[in-house]
Design a protein with these regions (language model features):
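N-terminal strand-loop-strand
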Residues: 1-33
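Charged, low-complexity, helix/coiled-coil-prone segments
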Residues: 1, 26, 30-32, 64-78, ...
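A small-molecule sensor/coupling module
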Residues: 126-132
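Long, compositionally biased
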Residues: 139-151
Length: 151
């Protein structure tokens, strides 16, 4: 068995959540959150910010850590267990541009009820639900949007 670690972001701007549409030779299609593998020497925060920037061309800021998800998949002659660390993030605008080299063909910001139905994977739906609840709590107490640095 192979163990792998990735990091990603639930990016929210003005109440809408960033998602990417991936299409790889018609074998894999669906809306996903930006995430990717930790590179040597990187922290989880650095990985999450880099992946959001690379996959969606979004300058984001970390708000807080929101948890991790785990899933398994198979590769030829082995099983991979992947742990993904997720961060709630904010962006300073609605701009996004999908990374074609990674087979992303569309991207955009969607309302919670829209993205919840668009996302392909149930573990990402759960993370979005948790992140959105955090966002609503922070917004209601006036903490959302305070002192964020965009990377």
């Amino acid at each position: 068995m192979i163990e792998a670690t990735s990091c990603g972001g639930v990016v929210i701007h003005r109440g809408k959540i960033l998602a990417l549409y991936k299409s790889y030779k018609n074998r894999y299609e669906g809306w996903v959150l930006p995430k990717g593998t930790v590179e040597k020497g990187e922290t989880h925060i650095q990985t999450a910010l880099r992946e959001v920037r690379e996959e969606a061309d979004v300058r984001a800021s970390i708000v807080k850590y929101i948890g991790k998800s785990q899933y398994n998949f198979t590769v030829p002659e082995d099983m991979v267990t992947k742990e993904v660390h997720w961060y709630l993030m904010t962006a300073d605008n609605y701009h996004s541009r999908p990374q074609k080299e990674e087979y992303f063909v569309d991207s955009g910001y969607y309302k919670f009820h829209e993205i919840y139905h668009l996302l392909r994977f149930s573990n990402e739906k759960q993370i979005v639900e948790r992140a959105y609840q955090e966002y609503l709590e922070m917004r209601s107490t006036g903490l959302w949007g305070k002192q964020h640095k965009y990377y």
